[in-house]
Structures are given as C-alpha cells and as structure tokens.
Amino acid sequence: DGKWIPIELKYTTKKCIKTINDEVYVLKEQGAKDQGCYNYLKDIMRIEEFRDKSNNFIEGYTIKITSEMSYLKPPTKVNCTYAEFSIEDGSIKTGCMNWATNTGKGTMRGMEAPIVLTGMYPINWKEYSKVDDTKSGTFMYLVNIISKKN
C-alpha cells in the first residue's frame, strides 16, 4: 500500500576463526571503530531525513551487530577524535555531533559532515549470540527505532 519502513543494518566483526558443528567460520578484523560509530549514527540521520520528506513513512530501524566489544565501552584515549559519535552502552545520541578538531583528514574522508539527529536515541546493547567464552565469541546487537513525527 505504498508505506515505507526503512531498515539499515551494520555488521562489524573482530577477527576470529571458529568451528561450529563441523563448519569453519572465518571473520575478518574490521577495526575503524570511529568510522563504524559515525556510520551507524549517519544511518539514523538518513532515516530521519527520509521520514521528514515522505508521507508514506511508518517507522524506521537501525541495527548493528558486532563481536567487537569495544563498541559497548566509552573511548579510552584522552584525545579521542570520535567521542561525540561513540555508541557506548547507556548513552543517548541526539543533536549535533562532530569530529574533534584534531581528527586526521584520512579518518574523516567522506564523513566530514556533522551528524545531526532530531530525535533522542538510547544506546542499549543486548546479547545476540554467544558461541564461546573467548573475546570474539559473543555477538551483541543494538536497535534504534526512528518514529514517525506526530
């Protein structure tokens, strides 16, 4: 009936090789947590922009699945360049977010624009799957709902 429910999915992994039920899984180290955080929030912004231009929007979803546990924690470096984009557990993302002034051009390439969110988005990570007790054996997920404007 012409209604829209956009969904953005991001999947980032920590390097690991696992054998489960005689099947071997090889996951690459994807790194670039700073860019991963930026891109997740950019997905929310993109769905908000779509919502604001469409009469057919119902609601939207952003989903991130990761085995990289550092996403759940606040940045550890004092001069962290992506602090405003951090999607650590328990945070709330809203408003205008920018890279720090000391961010390298290579890090920001193609991602120079600030992220501006009109809604408030709680960051609540949940366990998706636990393969084993190693650092790379747990997968977590994050879901945010972008609601229709009233």
Regions found by a protein language model. Give the residues of each.
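Conserved catalytic cores of phosphodiester-cleaving nucleases, focusing on short active-site segments
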Residues: D1-Y25, I47
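Residues at beta-strand starts and edge strands
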Residues: K3, I58-E59, G137-M140
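Surface-exposed cleft-lining segments at the edges of enzyme active sites
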Residues: E23-Y38
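Non-catalytic C-terminal interaction segments of nucleic acid-processing enzymes
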Residues: E68-N150
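Well-ordered, non-membrane alpha-helical segments in soluble/globular domains
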Residues: D34-R46, N79-S86
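Nucleic-acid nuclease catalytic cores
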Residues: E48-N79
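Low-complexity, flexible helical/coil segments
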Residues: K42-E49, W99-N102
